[in-house]
Amino acid sequence: MEKERLWSCSYVLVCIASFLTSFSFFLLVPTLPFYLVSELGVEQGMVGALLSCYVVAVLCVRPFAGCVADIFPRKKVYIISYMLFALAFVGYLGITSSVAAFVVLRVFHGFAFGALTTTANTLVIDIMPSSRRGEGLGYYGVMNNLAMASGPMTGLFIISSGNYTLLFIVALVTILIGFTMALVVRAPKKEILPLGKAKPVISADRFFLFAGIPACVAMMAIAVPYGITTSYMAVYAEEVGLTINSGLFFTVMALGLIVSRLHSGKMVDRGYITQIISVGMFIALFGVLGETLLHYVAGYSVVAADILYFLSALLMGYGYGTIFPAFNTLFVNLAPNSRRATANATYLTGWDVGIGIGMLLGGLLSAAGFCYCFAFGLLMLLFALLFFTSYVTRHFNKYRLR
């Protein structure tokens, strides 16, 4: 039987636009902690709290974005969200020394990012054939991973001369190119869900997929160590005395993400959804363990610490790359097609909550030492593995629609 076509023009354009969105995002992820401390004079212990306001904003907008994307044409919601996301980057060029202005801008940026990623994630599912959804999500995620490989390293290279203005200009130009790509995407027509049909206009299940609550809890716990890693690994490497370019960590991590996505999506299409997720968490667990032990290993041997540094990145990347397409498919399979955006919003909400917890508590625990915040991430991932295998798997098999 001939496979349905995956690589349509619109699918390719959405993937490229996603790469440029993620690249602009990852330019700022490892560099903003340095920006807050060196340019705005923020104390190290407060960095996590200031950065987490972005995630809180994303979290607040996700359910509404999912509802709107289910009700109105997704292409229009996608374009408006992309425009707002691009506009936020203009604001960074206007900040000089105001912490309050930074917080307001990050909240606005978070709202735009939450709406854009929720809609884009749903739009790409609409475009790809359902028989190749796992594979399509895997390749789509590779774009994010390529951005992770190049974005942090590029951002850290730009600020090595202390030029934060150039950093923000590069991010702005990148997102404007992505916006141009998004304008050309042709979205398939869908049946618009009437506001007054079947359910009240305002009801909780319009904003959140109740069948996905257990999986959402697991997703939240999985995201905690990921949020800690992306926010504090560069600073952690500096603290333990590693002399290598800390941006290379994200490159190696992205390599693991890419390699795993290239085959895990195909396994998902064959029906191994929960099995793939469990294996991915188990692999990622060893990566976070390596991060936790990095401080102690560096005290004995810098060479051994360098090896552990990159090994942890590879294991983290491979584990999470295995998890992502399977988890996304799990949520979509729990919802009817008319609530696909709501399912994606629930999936991403769990991720955002975990990232926010990681950024916030990671920043607070870093005052005692970064090894403690990575140890916290390790415990959360262990909980996620046990909870998923003992409960979420049974719940999914009972309530799945496809």
Predicted feature locations:
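Helix-to-loop junctions at the C-terminal end of transmembrane segments
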Residues: 62-73, 260-272
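Helix-loop boundary and gating motifs at the non-cytosolic
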Residues: 10-48, 223-236, 240
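Conserved MFS/SLC helix-loop-helix module at the cytosolic interface between two early adjacent transmembrane helices
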Residues: 60-96
